[in-house]
Amino acid sequence: MPTHLNLRYAEIESLWPGVEALQGLADEYGIKDVFQDAGGKMLQLAIATGLDLVPGRTGPDARDRIGNLYEVKTVDMAGKKSGGFTTNHHMTKDTIARYRNRRWVFATYDRITLMEAYLVEAEDLEPIFRKWEHDLRVKDHLNNPKIPVDFVREIGTPMYLKDVPPPWAVRATTGVTENDISSGVSA
């Protein structure tokens, strides 16, 4: 740890152009500050999944190019074997009704690094929605119920897995086509 305030000034100055370049990319996605509200994480996720981010703190988090709306939930799994995605600090029946009309993207991170992202259809979350509704019979709201990461991994369709390139990227770098793959040709 530095003992003098300016000991690492040259280091941060040399790194800063990369941060500014990252912010320039984030500007294209409507992210005003990569250091606020998980801006850098949302930028990485938007690029990895091809979703457009919806600005604001209320309503859907993202939409795809054909207009489907998405809830996006993230969790930092650094140092954890299991965990859960937080949802809403004031979960009500109205919130659940809204959730039933959206697709979902769940993403796990190792600190700032996107590790995996899964697409989950609302109907696949129905067991969780029903449990929440059952719990709401005796309460006016639930305080941030979680959706287990392992459950999402079980029911979700992978959209992104770190270190596993998507099929289009493999073709782009190797020149191997789907016909080559089906006929047994390798790179």
For each predicted feature, which ranges?
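Nucleic-acid endonuclease domains
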Residues: M1-A187
